[in-house]
Amino acid sequence: MTSYRNGPDAKGLFGRFGGQYVAETLMPLILDLAREYEKAKDDPAFQEELAYFQRDYVGRPSPLYFAERLTEHCGGAKIYLKREELNHTGAHKINNCIGQILLARRMGKKRIIAETGAGMHGVATATVAARFGLQCVIYMGTTDIDRQQANVFRMKLLGAEVIPVTAGTGTLKDAMNEALRDWVTNVDSTFYLIGTVAGPHPYPAMVRDFQAVIGKETREQLAEKEGRLPDSLVACIGGGSNAMGLFHPFLDDAGVQIVGVEAAGHGIDTGKHAASLNGGVPGVLHGNRTFLLQDADGQIIDAHSISAGLDYPGIGPEHAWLHDTGRVEYTSITDDEALEAFHTCCRLEGIIPALESSHALAEVFKRAPSLPKEHIMVVNLSGRGDKDMQTVMHHMQQESKA
Protein backbone atom coordinates (compact mmCIF):
# COMPACT_ATOMS: atom_id res chain seq x y z
CA MET A 1 0.00 0.00 0.00
CA THR A 2 1.26 3.48 -0.83
CA SER A 3 1.68 5.61 2.26
CA TYR A 4 -0.08 8.97 2.59
CA ARG A 5 2.57 10.01 5.11
CA ASN A 6 5.71 10.22 2.95
CA GLY A 7 5.25 13.74 1.56
CA PRO A 8 6.57 16.14 0.59
CA ASP A 9 9.18 15.11 -1.99
CA ALA A 10 12.67 16.68 -2.19
CA LYS A 11 11.23 19.75 -3.95
CA GLY A 12 8.66 20.25 -1.22
CA LEU A 13 5.77 19.01 -3.35
CA PHE A 14 2.69 17.06 -2.28
CA GLY A 15 1.57 15.83 -5.71
CA ARG A 16 0.96 19.04 -7.70
CA PHE A 17 0.84 21.25 -4.60
CA GLY A 18 3.41 22.95 -2.36
CA GLY A 19 6.85 23.95 -3.63
CA GLN A 20 9.06 26.99 -3.05
CA TYR A 21 7.70 30.04 -4.88
CA VAL A 22 9.79 32.76 -3.24
CA ALA A 23 11.96 35.75 -4.16
CA GLU A 24 15.50 34.79 -5.19
CA THR A 25 16.92 36.58 -2.14
CA LEU A 26 15.00 34.16 0.09
CA MET A 27 15.99 30.96 -1.70
CA PRO A 28 19.34 30.43 0.12
CA LEU A 29 17.60 31.04 3.44
CA ILE A 30 14.78 28.60 2.68
CA LEU A 31 17.26 25.90 1.63
CA ASP A 32 19.31 26.55 4.77
CA LEU A 33 16.19 26.29 6.92
CA ALA A 34 15.22 22.99 5.28
CA ARG A 35 18.72 21.60 5.94
CA GLU A 36 18.74 22.76 9.56
CA TYR A 37 15.29 21.32 10.15
CA GLU A 38 16.32 17.90 8.76
CA LYS A 39 19.35 17.94 11.09
CA ALA A 40 17.27 18.94 14.11
CA LYS A 41 14.71 16.22 13.36
CA ASP A 42 17.41 13.56 13.66
CA ASP A 43 19.12 15.13 16.68
CA PRO A 44 18.13 13.41 19.95
CA ALA A 45 19.18 16.50 21.97
CA PHE A 46 16.78 18.71 19.97
CA GLN A 47 13.93 16.22 20.35
CA GLU A 48 14.63 15.86 24.08
CA GLU A 49 14.52 19.62 24.62
CA LEU A 50 11.33 19.88 22.55
CA ALA A 51 9.72 17.14 24.67
CA TYR A 52 10.77 18.95 27.86
CA PHE A 53 9.13 22.23 26.80
CA GLN A 54 6.01 20.46 25.49
CA ARG A 55 5.59 18.82 28.88
CA ASP A 56 6.65 21.44 31.44
CA TYR A 57 5.93 24.70 29.59
CA VAL A 58 3.01 23.88 27.28
CA GLY A 59 1.38 21.35 29.61
CA ARG A 60 1.21 18.31 27.33
CA PRO A 61 -0.20 15.80 26.91
CA SER A 62 -3.54 17.56 26.51
CA PRO A 63 -6.47 15.43 27.73
CA LEU A 64 -8.68 13.31 25.47
CA TYR A 65 -12.06 13.90 27.07
CA PHE A 66 -15.24 11.84 26.60
CA ALA A 67 -17.97 14.45 26.03
CA GLU A 68 -20.77 12.53 27.71
CA ARG A 69 -23.41 15.29 27.56
CA LEU A 70 -22.73 16.12 23.90
CA THR A 71 -22.87 12.40 23.11
CA GLU A 72 -26.26 12.11 24.88
CA HIS A 73 -27.49 15.26 23.12
CA CYS A 74 -26.64 13.85 19.67
CA GLY A 75 -27.87 10.36 20.54
CA GLY A 76 -25.46 8.50 18.28
CA ALA A 77 -21.66 8.29 18.01
CA LYS A 78 -19.43 8.52 21.06
CA ILE A 79 -17.79 11.97 21.00
CA TYR A 80 -14.29 12.61 22.34
CA LEU A 81 -12.71 16.07 22.51
CA LYS A 82 -8.96 16.49 22.11
CA ARG A 83 -8.48 19.39 24.52
CA GLU A 84 -5.91 21.60 22.78
CA GLU A 85 -7.55 24.65 24.37
CA LEU A 86 -5.95 23.63 27.68
CA ASN A 87 -2.42 24.25 26.36
CA HIS A 88 -0.44 27.27 27.56
CA THR A 89 -1.79 30.31 25.60
CA GLY A 90 -5.11 28.55 24.96
CA ALA A 91 -4.74 26.84 21.58
CA HIS A 92 -2.77 24.39 19.46
CA LYS A 93 -0.54 27.20 18.09
CA ILE A 94 2.08 26.88 20.86
CA ASN A 95 3.02 23.32 19.72
CA ASN A 96 4.50 24.72 16.53
CA CYS A 97 5.94 27.88 18.11
CA ILE A 98 8.00 25.95 20.64
CA GLY A 99 9.42 23.77 17.86
CA GLN A 100 10.29 26.68 15.58
CA ILE A 101 11.77 28.90 18.32
CA LEU A 102 14.17 26.09 19.28
CA LEU A 103 15.14 25.89 15.60
CA ALA A 104 15.59 29.68 15.38
CA ARG A 105 17.87 29.63 18.42
CA ARG A 106 19.83 26.73 16.92
CA MET A 107 20.32 28.83 13.74
CA GLY A 108 21.54 31.83 15.76
CA LYS A 109 18.63 34.11 14.79
CA LYS A 110 18.00 37.07 17.11
CA ARG A 111 14.78 38.50 15.67
CA ILE A 112 11.47 36.68 15.22
CA ILE A 113 8.67 37.83 12.92
CA ALA A 114 5.21 36.33 12.51
CA GLU A 115 1.80 37.00 11.02
CA THR A 116 -1.42 36.53 12.97
CA GLY A 117 -5.15 36.57 12.24
CA ALA A 118 -7.10 35.69 15.37
CA GLY A 119 -4.06 36.71 17.38
CA MET A 120 -3.50 33.24 18.85
CA HIS A 121 -0.39 32.56 16.78
CA GLY A 122 0.83 36.08 17.56
CA VAL A 123 0.37 35.47 21.29
CA ALA A 124 2.07 32.06 21.10
CA THR A 125 5.00 33.55 19.13
CA ALA A 126 5.36 36.50 21.53
CA THR A 127 5.24 33.99 24.40
CA VAL A 128 8.11 31.82 23.16
CA ALA A 129 10.13 34.88 22.07
CA ALA A 130 9.82 36.22 25.64
CA ARG A 131 10.86 32.86 27.08
CA PHE A 132 14.00 32.75 24.90
CA GLY A 133 14.80 36.47 25.07
CA LEU A 134 14.43 37.21 21.35
CA GLN A 135 13.13 40.37 19.67
CA CYS A 136 9.61 39.83 18.32
CA VAL A 137 7.61 41.66 15.63
CA ILE A 138 4.04 40.62 14.81
CA TYR A 139 2.18 41.69 11.65
CA MET A 140 -1.58 41.89 12.06
CA GLY A 141 -4.30 43.27 9.78
CA THR A 142 -6.24 46.29 11.09
CA THR A 143 -9.57 44.43 10.73
CA ASP A 144 -8.24 41.65 12.95
CA ILE A 145 -6.75 44.15 15.42
CA ASP A 146 -10.23 45.66 15.83
CA ARG A 147 -11.89 42.33 16.55
CA GLN A 148 -9.08 40.89 18.70
CA GLN A 149 -8.14 43.74 21.06
CA ALA A 150 -7.41 41.46 24.01
CA ASN A 151 -4.88 39.40 22.06
CA VAL A 152 -3.16 42.57 20.78
CA PHE A 153 -2.75 43.71 24.39
CA ARG A 154 -1.41 40.26 25.36
CA MET A 155 1.25 40.42 22.64
CA LYS A 156 2.38 43.85 23.83
CA LEU A 157 2.47 42.67 27.45
CA LEU A 158 4.77 39.86 26.31
CA GLY A 159 7.15 42.41 24.79
CA ALA A 160 6.25 42.08 21.11
CA GLU A 161 5.87 44.97 18.69
CA VAL A 162 2.54 44.70 16.85
CA ILE A 163 2.57 46.30 13.39
CA PRO A 164 -0.89 47.11 11.96
CA VAL A 165 -1.37 46.20 8.29
CA THR A 166 -3.83 48.43 6.44
CA ALA A 167 -3.41 46.90 2.95
CA GLY A 168 -6.20 44.86 1.35
CA THR A 169 -8.89 43.89 3.84
CA GLY A 170 -6.49 44.14 6.76
CA THR A 171 -6.68 40.41 7.53
CA LEU A 172 -4.36 37.40 7.68
CA LYS A 173 -3.44 37.31 3.96
CA ASP A 174 -2.29 40.95 4.12
CA ALA A 175 -0.37 40.38 7.35
CA MET A 176 1.43 37.44 5.73
CA ASN A 177 2.36 39.57 2.70
CA GLU A 178 3.94 42.19 4.99
CA ALA A 179 5.81 39.58 7.02
CA LEU A 180 7.28 38.13 3.81
CA ARG A 181 8.39 41.64 2.76
CA ASP A 182 10.10 42.15 6.11
CA TRP A 183 11.84 38.78 5.81
CA VAL A 184 13.28 39.61 2.37
CA THR A 185 14.87 42.79 3.77
CA ASN A 186 16.18 41.25 7.01
CA VAL A 187 17.25 37.82 5.83
CA ASP A 188 20.34 37.36 8.01
CA SER A 189 19.04 38.35 11.44
CA THR A 190 15.44 37.24 11.15
CA PHE A 191 13.52 34.00 11.54
CA TYR A 192 10.00 33.97 10.08
CA LEU A 193 7.82 31.86 12.38
CA ILE A 194 4.89 30.85 10.14
CA GLY A 195 1.79 29.81 12.05
CA THR A 196 0.16 27.29 9.75
CA VAL A 197 0.91 24.46 7.29
CA ALA A 198 1.29 26.94 4.41
CA GLY A 199 4.16 28.98 3.00
CA PRO A 200 7.16 27.70 1.03
CA HIS A 201 8.76 24.30 1.78
CA PRO A 202 9.91 23.34 4.48
CA TYR A 203 7.17 25.18 6.42
CA PRO A 204 4.14 22.98 5.58
CA ALA A 205 6.00 19.79 6.58
CA MET A 206 7.76 21.38 9.55
CA VAL A 207 4.60 22.87 11.07
CA ARG A 208 2.76 19.57 10.50
CA ASP A 209 5.52 17.63 12.27
CA PHE A 210 5.45 19.95 15.29
CA GLN A 211 1.64 19.69 15.43
CA ALA A 212 1.57 15.90 14.92
CA VAL A 213 1.98 15.52 18.69
CA ILE A 214 -1.83 16.01 18.74
CA GLY A 215 -2.53 12.90 16.67
CA LYS A 216 0.21 10.82 18.31
CA GLU A 217 -1.22 11.52 21.78
CA THR A 218 -4.76 10.84 20.54
CA ARG A 219 -3.71 7.37 19.28
CA GLU A 220 -2.14 6.48 22.63
CA GLN A 221 -4.93 7.96 24.74
CA LEU A 222 -7.70 6.25 22.79
CA ALA A 223 -5.87 2.92 22.88
CA GLU A 224 -5.82 3.29 26.67
CA LYS A 225 -9.50 4.34 26.95
CA GLU A 226 -11.14 2.21 24.25
CA GLY A 227 -8.46 -0.27 23.22
CA ARG A 228 -8.72 0.72 19.57
CA LEU A 229 -8.44 3.40 16.87
CA PRO A 230 -11.15 6.03 16.36
CA ASP A 231 -13.72 5.54 13.58
CA SER A 232 -13.59 9.18 12.55
CA LEU A 233 -11.60 12.38 13.14
CA VAL A 234 -12.96 15.90 12.67
CA ALA A 235 -11.08 19.23 12.73
CA CYS A 236 -11.59 22.76 11.44
CA ILE A 237 -9.38 24.21 8.72
CA GLY A 238 -8.10 27.72 8.03
CA GLY A 239 -4.55 27.11 6.85
CA GLY A 240 -5.00 23.71 8.44
CA SER A 241 -2.33 23.10 11.08
CA ASN A 242 -4.54 21.84 13.92
CA ALA A 243 -6.21 19.45 11.46
CA MET A 244 -2.92 18.27 9.96
CA GLY A 245 -1.61 17.65 13.47
CA LEU A 246 -4.55 15.41 14.33
CA PHE A 247 -4.85 13.73 10.91
CA HIS A 248 -1.26 12.94 9.92
CA PRO A 249 -0.57 10.05 12.32
CA PHE A 250 -3.80 8.34 11.10
CA LEU A 251 -3.51 8.85 7.32
CA ASP A 252 -2.42 5.26 6.68
CA ASP A 253 -5.15 3.74 8.87
CA ALA A 254 -7.71 2.94 6.16
CA GLY A 255 -10.48 2.31 8.71
CA VAL A 256 -10.30 5.84 10.10
CA GLN A 257 -12.57 8.32 8.30
CA ILE A 258 -11.04 11.81 8.26
CA VAL A 259 -13.07 15.01 7.89
CA GLY A 260 -11.74 18.57 7.52
CA VAL A 261 -14.18 21.44 8.04
CA GLU A 262 -13.78 24.73 6.19
CA ALA A 263 -15.57 28.00 6.97
CA ALA A 264 -18.61 28.51 4.72
CA GLY A 265 -19.20 32.01 6.13
CA HIS A 266 -22.58 33.26 4.87
CA GLY A 267 -22.76 30.23 2.53
CA ILE A 268 -20.56 29.04 -0.37
CA ASP A 269 -23.08 30.33 -2.94
CA THR A 270 -22.92 33.89 -1.52
CA GLY A 271 -19.20 34.24 -2.29
CA LYS A 272 -18.67 35.39 1.31
CA HIS A 273 -16.80 32.40 2.72
CA ALA A 274 -13.31 31.02 3.39
CA ALA A 275 -13.70 27.54 1.88
CA SER A 276 -10.73 27.23 -0.51
CA LEU A 277 -11.29 23.55 -1.35
CA ASN A 278 -15.07 23.76 -1.67
CA GLY A 279 -15.08 27.09 -3.51
CA GLY A 280 -11.59 27.72 -4.90
CA VAL A 281 -9.17 26.76 -7.68
CA PRO A 282 -5.43 25.97 -7.70
CA GLY A 283 -2.99 28.89 -7.76
CA VAL A 284 0.12 30.27 -6.05
CA LEU A 285 0.11 32.35 -2.85
CA HIS A 286 2.61 32.89 -0.03
CA GLY A 287 5.29 30.65 -1.50
CA ASN A 288 3.26 27.56 -2.36
CA ARG A 289 0.81 26.17 -4.90
CA THR A 290 -2.55 25.24 -3.38
CA PHE A 291 -6.30 25.82 -3.67
CA LEU A 292 -7.16 29.53 -3.42
CA LEU A 293 -10.18 31.79 -3.58
CA GLN A 294 -9.66 33.67 -6.87
CA ASP A 295 -11.67 35.64 -9.39
CA ALA A 296 -11.71 34.99 -13.16
CA ASP A 297 -8.48 37.04 -13.55
CA GLY A 298 -6.65 35.02 -10.90
CA GLN A 299 -6.82 37.82 -8.31
CA ILE A 300 -7.16 36.62 -4.72
CA ILE A 301 -10.69 37.15 -3.40
CA ASP A 302 -11.13 38.19 0.23
CA ALA A 303 -12.20 35.39 2.52
CA HIS A 304 -15.00 35.78 5.05
CA SER A 305 -15.63 33.90 8.29
CA ILE A 306 -17.01 34.92 11.67
CA SER A 307 -13.85 33.32 13.00
CA ALA A 308 -10.67 35.35 12.44
CA GLY A 309 -8.55 32.19 12.46
CA LEU A 310 -10.34 30.62 9.47
CA ASP A 311 -10.45 33.83 7.45
CA TYR A 312 -7.70 32.84 4.98
CA PRO A 313 -8.16 32.58 1.17
CA GLY A 314 -5.89 29.51 0.86
CA ILE A 315 -5.23 26.17 2.53
CA GLY A 316 -2.09 24.16 3.32
CA PRO A 317 -0.76 22.28 0.25
CA GLU A 318 -0.87 18.90 1.98
CA HIS A 319 -4.62 19.37 2.53
CA ALA A 320 -5.00 20.26 -1.17
CA TRP A 321 -3.23 17.00 -2.03
CA LEU A 322 -5.27 14.92 0.44
CA HIS A 323 -8.38 16.43 -1.16
CA ASP A 324 -7.06 15.45 -4.62
CA THR A 325 -6.39 11.86 -3.52
CA GLY A 326 -9.73 11.57 -1.72
CA ARG A 327 -8.13 10.36 1.53
CA VAL A 328 -9.69 13.22 3.51
CA GLU A 329 -13.24 14.49 3.07
CA TYR A 330 -13.58 18.28 3.20
CA THR A 331 -16.90 19.85 4.15
CA SER A 332 -17.91 23.35 5.24
CA ILE A 333 -19.95 24.96 8.04
CA THR A 334 -21.60 28.39 8.02
CA ASP A 335 -21.18 31.17 10.59
CA ASP A 336 -24.65 30.47 12.00
CA GLU A 337 -24.05 26.72 12.33
CA ALA A 338 -20.75 27.38 14.11
CA LEU A 339 -22.39 29.84 16.53
CA GLU A 340 -25.10 27.33 17.37
CA ALA A 341 -22.49 24.63 18.07
CA PHE A 342 -20.54 27.15 20.20
CA HIS A 343 -23.58 27.74 22.44
CA THR A 344 -24.38 24.01 22.65
CA CYS A 345 -20.85 23.15 23.80
CA CYS A 346 -20.91 25.95 26.41
CA ARG A 347 -24.23 24.86 27.87
CA LEU A 348 -23.75 21.11 27.79
CA GLU A 349 -20.07 20.63 28.63
CA GLY A 350 -19.07 23.81 30.47
CA ILE A 351 -16.38 24.34 27.84
CA ILE A 352 -16.22 27.60 25.86
CA PRO A 353 -14.69 26.64 22.50
CA ALA A 354 -13.07 28.98 19.99
CA LEU A 355 -15.30 29.88 17.03
CA GLU A 356 -12.76 28.05 14.83
CA SER A 357 -13.22 24.81 16.79
CA SER A 358 -17.00 25.38 16.81
CA HIS A 359 -16.99 24.73 13.04
CA ALA A 360 -15.64 21.22 13.74
CA LEU A 361 -18.19 20.70 16.53
CA ALA A 362 -21.03 21.74 14.20
CA GLU A 363 -19.94 19.08 11.69
CA VAL A 364 -19.84 16.49 14.49
CA PHE A 365 -23.38 17.45 15.57
CA LYS A 366 -24.55 16.90 11.98
CA ARG A 367 -22.96 13.46 11.68
CA ALA A 368 -23.13 11.91 15.14
CA PRO A 369 -26.93 11.38 15.43
CA SER A 370 -27.07 9.01 12.44
CA LEU A 371 -24.03 6.96 13.50
CA PRO A 372 -24.11 3.83 15.69
CA LYS A 373 -23.43 4.21 19.42
CA GLU A 374 -20.16 2.28 19.16
CA HIS A 375 -18.78 4.69 16.52
CA ILE A 376 -15.95 6.72 18.09
CA MET A 377 -15.49 10.30 16.84
CA VAL A 378 -12.58 12.47 17.92
CA VAL A 379 -12.92 16.22 17.38
CA ASN A 380 -10.01 18.59 17.79
CA LEU A 381 -10.96 21.35 20.20
CA SER A 382 -8.20 23.53 18.81
CA GLY A 383 -8.63 26.59 21.02
CA ARG A 384 -10.63 28.28 23.75
CA GLY A 385 -13.25 30.92 23.09
CA ASP A 386 -12.16 33.73 25.42
CA LYS A 387 -10.92 35.71 22.42
CA ASP A 388 -14.34 35.45 20.75
CA MET A 389 -16.50 37.00 23.48
CA GLN A 390 -16.84 40.35 21.67
CA THR A 391 -17.82 38.68 18.40
CA VAL A 392 -20.43 36.44 20.06
CA MET A 393 -21.84 39.31 22.15
CA HIS A 394 -22.12 41.48 19.04
CA HIS A 395 -23.92 38.67 17.21
CA MET A 396 -26.38 38.10 20.04
CA GLN A 397 -27.12 41.85 20.20
CA GLN A 398 -27.77 41.92 16.43
CA GLU A 399 -30.10 38.93 16.75
CA SER A 400 -32.07 40.44 19.63
CA LYS A 401 -32.54 43.63 17.55
CA ALA A 402 -33.76 41.57 14.60
Curated annotation (Swiss-Prot):
It comes from Pseudomonas aeruginosa (strain ATCC 15692 / DSM 22644 / CIP 104116 / JCM 14847 / LMG 12228 / 1C / PRS 101 / PAO1). One of its GO terms (molecular function) is tryptophan synthase activity. This is Tryptophan synthase beta chain. The beta subunit is responsible for the synthesis of L-tryptophan from indole and L-serine. It catalyses: (1S,2R)-1-C-(indol-3-yl)glycerol 3-phosphate + L-serine = D-glyceraldehyde 3-phosphate + L-tryptophan + H2O. PROSITE patterns: TRP_SYNTHASE_BETA. Its EC number is 4.2.1.20. GO terms for biological process: L-tryptophan biosynthetic process.
